[in-house]
From Swiss-Prot:
Any Pfam family the entry gives: OTCace_N
Pathway this chain belongs to: Pyrimidine metabolism; UMP biosynthesis via de novo pathway; (S)-dihydroorotate from bicarbonate: step 2/3
Record's catalysed reaction(s): carbamoyl phosphate + L-aspartate = N-carbamoyl-L-aspartate + phosphate + H(+)
Coiled coil start-end: none
Domain of life: Bacteria
Entry EC number(s): 2.1.3.2
GO biological process, one term: 'de novo' UMP biosynthetic process
Keywords for this protein: Pyrimidine biosynthesis, Transferase
Species, as recorded: Leptothrix cholodnii (strain ATCC 51168 / LMG 8142 / SP-6) (Leptothrix discophora (strain SP-6))
Identification of the protein by name: Aspartate carbamoyltransferase catalytic subunit
Recorded family membership: Belongs to the aspartate/ornithine carbamoyltransferase superfamily. ATCase family.
UniProt cross-references to InterPro entries, sorted A to Z: Asp/Orn_carbamoyltranf_P-bd (IPR006132), Asp/Orn_carbamoylTrfase (IPR006130), Asp/Orn_carbamoylTrfase_sf (IPR036901), Asp_carbamoyltransf (IPR002082), Asp_carbamoyltransf_Asp/Orn-bd (IPR006131)
Range of residues in the leader sequence: none
Length: 320
């Protein structure tokens, strides 16, 4: 998806859009994580605001349903003191047949400063970034199967928070990887940050073999895939993106690939368990694990606000 010149960066190598973790230099990833750390304390203040985006208009354009991502983006923008506009797609002109670019052109005429976009079509945020005015910034909140960069970044923040260093880590990503934009964003970021052992775990129908070309170890046996893992990232089954019988049943899937306390015992003693949500208990993870001592699923949500604040504040401060 990336052109020869990375469209996310200006000529000085500064971040002006966030479209994917693919192709982002380690220095940019580290800048985002370091900046997020400075925003964590804002959550604990009586007045949870900083003035960095005061006077800026942020438009949330969610063409797909979302709870955590949309809410945390709205909270993040408001804590940066931005004016936030949530476009109701079902009631907008897009529902009447208006093209994506016409929608963007009209919103740009309202002096938008930033678009946060979730879309079912891979590449939609790239298209918007290519056609919007130079002063307008675009953040990809998930596009098709392609990328979910802020989820990838908050996952990296979570890993760094608990593990301190990426070198030497063993990270297992388990579940429906073939349909997962989160998995792709995580793999690109983990690779750039120097994680030497990345594993993709799941049935053959849900794990693309070409991940091996990215240096990922593909495992179809759960026990092998999570053995001695320092980090386990569980993914839900994306039934809405599946066509045909890719799995025998949810029960059979849980038996083979659901994370239980017994299976977790195969991982490193201080392993952390992550999940981008929404969780399907009893399908990819049992409640004793999701709510247990190894789980950092709820802290991920908290960190997501700080990470999205970091992304928006950084790109808003850089010129195209």
């Amino acid at each position: 998806m990336l052109s020869r010149r990375n469209p996310q960066l200006n000529n000085h190598g500064e971040l002006i859009h966030l479209l994917s973790t693919e192709g982002l230099p380690r220095a940019v990833l580290t800048q985002i994580l370091d900046t997020a750390s400075t925003f964590l304390s804002v959550n604990d203040r009586d007045v949870k605001k900083v003035p960095l985006l005061r006077g800026k208009s942020v438009f949330n354009l969610f063409f797909e349903n979302s709870t955590r991502t949309r809410t945390t983006f709205e909270i993040a923008a408001k804590r940066l003191s931005a004016d936030v506009i949530n476009l109701d797609i079902a009631k907008s002109s897009a529902a009447k047949g208006e093209s994506l670019l016409d929608t963007i052109a009209n919103l740009s005429a309202m002096h938008a400063d930033m678009f946060v976009v979730r879309h079912s079509e891979s590449g939609a945020p790239y298209l918007i970034a290519e056609h919007c005015a130079p002063h307008v910034h675009v953040v990809n909140a998930g596009d098709g199967r392609h990328a979910h960069p802020t989820q990838g970044l908050l996952d990296m923040y979570t890993i760094r928070h608990y593990k301190k260093d990426f070198t030497g880590l063993r990270v297992a990503i388990v579940g429906d990887i073939v349909h997962s934009r989160v998995a792709r964003s995580d793999i690109h970021a983990l690779t750039t940050l120097g994680v030497p052992d990345i594993r993709a775990v799941g049935p053959k129908t849900l794990v693309p073999g070409d991940l091996r070309d990215m240096g990922v170890r593909v495992c179809h046996d759960m026990a092998e895939g999570i053995k001695d893992a320092d980090v386990i990232i569980m993914l839900r089954l994306q039934n809405e993106r599946m066509s045909g019988a890719m799995l025998p049943s949810a029960g059979e899937y849980f038996k083979s690939y659901g994370l239980t306390a017994d299976k977790l015992a195969l991982a490193a003693p201080d392993c952390i368990v992550m999940h981008p949500g929404p969780i399907n208990r009893g399908v990819e993870i049992e409640s004793t694990v999701a709510d247990g001592a190894h789980s950092v699923i709820l802290p991920q949500v908290t960190f997501g606000i700080a990470v999205r604040m970091a992304v928006m504040s950084i790109i808003a401060g850089n010129d195209a």
